[in-house]
From Swiss-Prot:
Entry protein name: Zinc finger and SCAN domain containing protein 4C
SMART domains in the record: SCAN, ZnF_C2H2
Compartments where found: Nucleus; Chromosome, Telomere
Species per Swiss-Prot/TrEMBL record: Mus musculus
Record's GO cellular component terms: chromosome, telomeric region; cytoplasm; nucleoplasm; nucleus
Upregulation: Transcriptionally regulated by ZSCAN10.
Length: 506
């Protein structure tokens, strides 16, 4: 298997997960358990060198993961190979693959014999168009190879005396072989960004433009000799594994390609602030292209990438067209930067609109309302205050025409007018009360026997407080003492009257 070239993942439960680089400092010997490199002991680093500390950390991590004192060289290599195979992303179910590895007894030969292509994901294709040349490439194919093959296809379609006799072979097998030869040398250069150095055959003001369309899978449309089929989830071409796949449909001429695929003359002028904002919003999704240093200044090599969702439309002529429904992202190399390319693509004369991006001039700006003194905005508040002062008593009693500010005050007052309610009226003296509790307290006066009776003299009282005051006579208790003359009093009312009459000046 082509992808079995580096570490394996989650094979030993007690091992650390780590992926070493190609230039690992571990030296493998025939007998690793007896090799001096496996028994190397580091002295403490006193110089504070970060490189030394990093190497020591990697050494310990590798030894803890691979355990060279317990495993043979073949076991460690198998562990590394399976780890890298899982990291390539081609496997459908990593858990199932790990279970197969355990079932094979960690034997790579038996493990490879039990494998089938069902464990791999189907290849994802990307539709690429450059100057009228179209093809389907594997998502992991280097962008430099894509541009090179499209140029060869373009030169093969031109009716020149040289290529009429010797046509360029652009078959699928040749493209696969080319991608496999060059992918190993370029895999380290495409980890974070896609690099394209074009301009090998540029002449004059010729422009090499590349259109990469990301589309979803829909039923294919066939009309005439052109068949367009776009797989689901296609991503832009980049470097990766050495397995590449390319399909070339019939190459239409430049006139048959839609106008939006044609390159534009991108200039450095008339870049407004809104275009800079548009660039800042979409620069994370755009593909970066770096031009070579050997390209003359009068040659312009640009990369034009559209990220779209393809939906079928009625077919026109010999070529079916789709409607892009996503924002256009463009990046340019050589003489014009990415920001200027976006500024030209979204110019004022361009009728296309970018969803989610609104110009500052189109955004509604609400005028601030000043609430200063004597301002018109304060008129509603002033009228409200005047009305509140004028109509302070909003609740009027229908019986006596009294005014009240609050509804609860009016309802409490209206209880006095409810003569028909017997619970508020004293039956004996016909006195009206606001609350039933007040009426009940009052009715004790009319009772022949008062409920509270003194235990000493058997005198009865209507209220309990009166009984307590009476009992102080029998006990001789005088709790209230004057601080000025030391006189004692039985009731608080008598004490306060004494203070007013005799100690007012004090």
């Amino acid at each position: 298997m082509a992808s079995q070239q580096a570490p394996a993942k989650d094979l030993q439960t007690n091992n650390l997960e780590f992926t070493p680089t190609d230039s690992s400092g571990v030296q493998w010997a025939e007998d690793i358990s007896n090799s001096p490199s496996a028994q190397l002991n580091f002295s403490p680093s006193n110089n504070g060198c970060w490189a030394t500390q990093e190497l020591q950390s990697l050494w310990k991590m590798f030894n803890s993961w691979l355990q060279p004192e317990k495993q043979t060289k073949e076991q460690m290599i198998s562990q590394l190979v399976l780890e890298q195979f899982l990291l390539t992303g081609h496997c459908k179910d990593k858990y199932a693959l790990t279970e197969k590895w355990k079932a094979s007894g960690s034997d790579m030969r038996r493990f490879m014999e039990s494998l089938t292509d069902e464990c791999l994901k189907p290849p994802v294709m990307v539709h690429v168009s450059m100057q009228g040349q179209e093809a389907l490439f594997s998502e992991n194919m280097p962008l430099k190879e894509v541009i090179k093959l499209l140029k060869q296809q373009q030169s093969a379609t031109r009716p020149t005396p040289d290529n009429e006799q010797m046509p360029v072979d652009t078959t699928q097998d040749r493209l696969l072989a080319t991608g496999q030869e060059n992918s190993e040398n370029e895999c380290n250069n495409s980890c974070n960004a896609t690099e394209a150095n074009v301009g090998e055959s540029c002449s004059g003001n010729e422009m090499d433009s590349l259109l990469i369309i990301q589309k979803e899978q829909h039923p294919e449309h066939e009309e005439g000799n052109v068949v367009c089929q776009f797989p689901h989830g296609a991503r832009r071409a980049s470097q990766g594994t050495p397995s590449h796949h390319v399909d070339f449909p019939s190459a239409p001429t430049t006139a048959d390609v839609p106008m939006e695929e044609q390159p534009k003359d991108l200039s450095r002028e008339n870049i407004s602030e809104d275009k800079n904002n548009c660039y800042n919003t979409s620069r994370n999704a755009a593909t970066q292209v770096y031009s070579g240093d050997n390209i003359p200044r009068n040659k312009s090599d640009s990369l034009f990438i559209n990220k779209r969702i393809y939906h079928p439309e009625p077919e026109v002529g010999d070529i079916p067209y789709g409607v892009p429904q996503d924002s256009t992202r463009a990046s340019q190399g050589t003489s014009t930067c990415l920001q200027e390319s976006l500024g030209e693509c979204f110019s004022e004369n361009d009728p296309r609109e970018v969803p989610g991006l609104q110009s500052r001039q189109e955004q509604p700006i609400s005028d601030p309302v000043l609430l200063g003194k004597n301002h018109e905005a304060n008129l509603p508040c002033e009228s409200h205050q005047k009305r509140f002062c004028r109509d302070a008593k909003l609740y009027k009693c229908e019986e006596c025409s009294r005014m009240f500010k609050h509804a609860r005050s009016l309802s409490s007052h209206q209880r006095t007018h409810l003569n028909k309610k017997s619970e508020l009226l004293c039956v004996t003296c016909q006195k009206m009360f606001k609350r039933v509790s007040d009426r009940r307290t009052h009715e004790i006066i009319h009772m022949p026997e008062k409920p509270f009776k003194c235990s000493t003299c058997e005198k009865s009282f209507s209220h309990k407080t009166n009984l307590k005051s009476h009992e102080m006579i029998h006990t001789g208790e005088m709790p209230y003492v004057c601080s000025l003359c030391s006189r004692r009093f039985r009731q608080s009312s008598t004490y306060h009257r004494h203070l007013r009459n005799y100690h007012r000046s004090d």
